[in-house]
């Protein structure tokens, strides 16, 4: 736990979701941030290092303890809150400028979770999430094989799930990541003969960022071009980042993607 390099994990070229989210949020110093489903706390501590006032929420006391230790190792503090995403149990008056949920929604009831989280977003605030999508055949083969490193409650997001955001938020922006860059995972399996049941590839690719950088970076540029020219390819990406906001005047403004 203490060996986690929080900045490296979140700033790696092979962590495009967090790099985009950090740019999207801008200067977060002094902002109130809720990390829902914080896990070991890598994102919570990173946001705290960037100056945010962080509350880390998880249904596991062990995870919250780990997040607290990681914060201490990095010289920052986070407030911990024990609760499930579908039942936040926060004080009704609790408000946050930023609500972050990383790799969470595909484990929970999305509609219920969004309905519980939304009241705690401050006026002018933003909720940002990222999760896997359901449609890429290569990833679906990986999912069928890597049963030992996945959980039974996982349900990668489909089009219907993405539409749920518009039920709860007036403004929705979506960005997509990992298309041709998925070649890295094929190399891991086919050329390097690595076992997806022994290693969590989504963690390995971040940990081995320097090793994959020369391949990843040009493929990422190719992805950007392809996703602009051929928008339907977006649903074949591995992950989607969704940023949502509630207008100061309810029920105004058009949804956009």
Regions found by a protein language model. Give the residues of each.
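Conserved class I S-adenosyl-L-methionine
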Residues: 1-28, 128-150
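Short alpha-helix
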Residues: 154-175
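A C-terminal cap/extension of S-adenosyl-L-methionine-dependent methyltransferases
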Residues: 181-257
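A short glycine-rich, Lys/Arg-flanked "PGG" loop and its adjoining helix->strand segment in the class I
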Residues: 112-123
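A short acidic, Gly/Pro-enriched loop at the edge of an enzyme's catalytic core
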Residues: 89-98
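A short SAM/SAH-binding and catalytic strip from SAM-dependent methyltransferases
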Residues: 98-111
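Class I SAM-dependent methyltransferase SAM/SAH-binding core
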Residues: 34, 40-87
